[in-house]
Amino acid sequence: MNPTDIADTTLDESIYSNYYLYESIPKPCTKEGIKAFGELFLPPLYSLVFVFGLLGNSVVVLVLFKYKRLRSMTDVYLLNLAISDLLFVFSLPFWGYYAADQWVFGLGLCKMISWMYLVGFYSGIFFVMLMSIDRYLAIVHAVFSLRARTLTYGVITSLATWSVAVFASLPGFLFSTCYTERNHTYCKTKYSLNSTTWKVLSSLEINILGLVIPLGIMLFCYSMIIRTLQHCKNEKKNKAVKMIFAVVVLFLGFWTPYNIVLFLETLVELEVLQDCTFERYLDYAIQATETLAFVHCCLNPIIYFFLGEKFRKYILQLFKTCRGLFVLCQYCGLLQIYSADTPSSSYTQSTMDHDLHDAL
């Protein structure tokens, strides 16, 4: 139900043809405060997530290409998970502006941004699930994993995963539309009139593909991993499991509330739940859990840094390299100025190398 819509009534509409009488019809569920809440809090929160999510996941992509060079199936899955997070990040400026004002970007971007949102959602949880399967094969079926956990199979399964995510997101692309109502432009999913079937199918799709199936697979994988590690203690394996386990737990913790709230919203749309106070709280919950889900985009790089020793080493090397380039550029600028002022300068390359070495 649109927050600004007036509920249907069984009274004859002709009685209320007069404008003032029509406006005086009591609205069963006013939600102006909910929109004001979103206008105030969502744009700054989305901006923070955009900045930190973009920086963190860009660093992960750089590390994977520059240092790890995608040598294994795990590297391929980590790269694709970072790309999934970046899809969310790139959509946030649009949603932030939309929350503060209205949709001004047209129908094309409305469909594209909504589609990016869903593709990022599905692909993200699919790759977290694949990472759990990858750890399961590496630890529980170590011999078989030597043949199965190859770079080639990693690329093939990643392409298949993206295909499934894109296909699952098509309804969001097809049914997202722009419309203007009471001088306010919206970008929302609108189904045909009285079409409850699509609403139910959409909710079931998100909850089954986005929660039930992945959660079942992850629980199976980690129960078998824990069972195996009880008989085989290996410090490196334990650290790898901690990192992947943290990714899984945080993903479920940040996305499960949103899935539950979406399911409850569907029940409201189907008029299974009809209570004004409950609807208002549900709208607040949608904004809160959706923002919580977006925050997840920033967390995976932090997990890699604190739990992955190699990642921590590579990230520090990357920052040292960037710092060295920055210092080098500073010295290049100083050298040009100094050379222009004093043509007989004795500032040599070896001197600059020594200074750069000291800076690093």
UniProtKB/Swiss-Prot annotation:
This is C-C chemokine receptor type 4. Disulfide bonds join C110-C187. GO terms for biological process: calcium-mediated signaling; cell chemotaxis; chemotaxis; homeostasis of number of cells; immune response; inflammatory response; interneuron migration; positive regulation of cytosolic calcium ion concentration. GO terms for molecular function: C-C chemokine binding; C-C chemokine receptor activity; chemokine receptor activity. The lineage of its organism: Eukaryota, Metazoa, Chordata, Craniata, Vertebrata. The chain crosses the membrane at residues 40-67, 78-98, 112-133, 151-175, 207-226, 243-267, 285-308. Predominantly expressed in the thymus, in peripheral blood leukocytes, including T-cells, mostly CD4+ cells, and basophils, and in platelets; at lower levels, in the spleen and in monocytes. Detected also in macrophages, IL-2-activated natural killer cells and skin-homing memory T-cells, mostly the ones expressing the cutaneous lymphocyte antigen (CLA). Expressed in brain microvascular and coronary artery endothelial cells. It comes from Homo sapiens (Human). The keyword Signal does not apply. The gene is CCR4. It is a multi-pass membrane protein. Signal peptide: none annotated. It comes from the Eukaryota.
